[in-house]
């Protein structure tokens, strides 16, 4: 087996404008492609940031996350940052609420969580 890296991470959102604004305008992802899929009546936006590719699907009437944040499947996305404090300040200036900064008990590194418009947990970690 020759797995090299994660190719892309798909995310399902409920609101096209809110999700696009959050990931592009607030977090700084750039748009690679943006497509409406009439056969599914949904949108697919491919985003990229520093080698990370997200597929953002906007699908009407999907069920909400079943629990916070413990549910089978993907638990959250974690982004590496140089400084959690600086990143928290930047997020807060943009109106994004973050949880209190804490230390990862296994690595001793600072970390915290914030949430996308559909309450997908996102982590920043030094």
Regions found by a protein language model. Give the residues of each.
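Core segments of cupin and vicinal oxygen chelate
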Residues: 11-53, 93
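Short amphipathic alpha-helices within nucleic acid-binding modules
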Residues: 22, 85-90
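A short, acidic/glycine-rich surface segment
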Residues: 32-34, 40-42, 56, 61-67, ...
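Mid-chain, well-packed structural core segment of small domains
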Residues: 70-85
